[in-house]
Amino acid sequence: GGRAQAWAGQGELRGAETMSDSQNNAGLWHTDVERLRGRDPYDALAGRRVPEWVRSHARLRQVAIQLRKRMPIEMGGLLGVEPFVMAKTVGCALAAAARYGDSDAIPALTGALEATAGSLGGGAFGYEFDVQTRWAFYPAGSPNLIATVFVARGLAAAGVASGAPSLVTEAARSAEFVRNSLHAAAPRPYYRYTLTSERLVHNANFLGAGLVAMTATLGGQDASTAPAMSAATAAALTSIEAQRGDGSWPYGADAFLGWSDNFHTAYNLDGLLQVWLATGDDRVRTSLDRGVRHWQADFFGPEGEPKYYPSRPLPYDIHSAGTAIDVAARLASWGWDTGELAERVAAWTERHLVDPASGATYFQKRHNRTDKRHFVRWGDAHLALGRASLALLREGRRDPLEVAVARSSGVLPDAD
């Protein structure tokens, strides 16, 4: 508690009087819990009309999810999917509130988080529907690393920005869950995506390492946090070793997971940034530099359009766009030359993937049409993160959680 109070003021935002027009443009999305309710491109198996013979076979589950995602019409109602609030969405809203200095929104958001089906207890979070990918099945009510990290970071950011150490303690519980339940030690250390899969997925590993390192650093630089710091760094180095000569990473370690896309690359960079801020490790910084150069050079068009793959740009996806704005803006705040990229992607996104009347996001843009389906977690939540990070960058400020971590680690001297 004492440590938390000591750093809480360091990261605190200055309050409502400093909010820029960027927040007004964001429509104060994070302040209205009802706006967090919606459907998801991967929620097909939440549909009450999906028959058991589909649910009982892995391949059919995957087909159902992919059809729902790819059909350019909203099938949620036909499938019987009721709009719902996702834990990860609330985590993003908490982080956005922290960046805007909007402490008043935090109690309602933490209440909404507790009410989600993805809030599983013990610091673990998951998705509210069954997910079948080409490499894993994780049912509703099972923890996964991505949801856990985004919620935990939202809680930690809200705790730092509002001076509420209990929220940082909740984030530390999530990090403890990742450390104890998702850590694989052999043949090399890494953090697993789910409890049941042994696949090494690099973006999950980097984000898990970032969460563990971040919360350990906030806990103080002493013998009690040394094992967590060491484990996080070792896990990050496992995926750093998988970085290719051009600075890219495959999605995962298996041969059939060799693709590289925009938003998972951004997740890699985000996780690496957190590890570097928490440790100052030169090996992490070198890998991050290489990854940023590749991402900047190969994943964006001249107007800021976010390519899906370097060699196959379409579709331009709102998740790629929002994540790119967020990560590029935060990298720029720490000295990387990505500020202009964040601005270009933001301008392109507002023109092409945001409804000008409601502010709701569109799913994807293709050559001759825009898929205007609205998915809150996939689109609104990540664009809210991007808008909030860009607002801070324009004001010459940094993410309050990242400031607290960097000050605790010594990466950012107290005088800065």
PLM regions: where:
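Glycan-recognition and catalytic cores of secretory/periplasmic carbohydrate-active enzymes
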Residues: 6-416
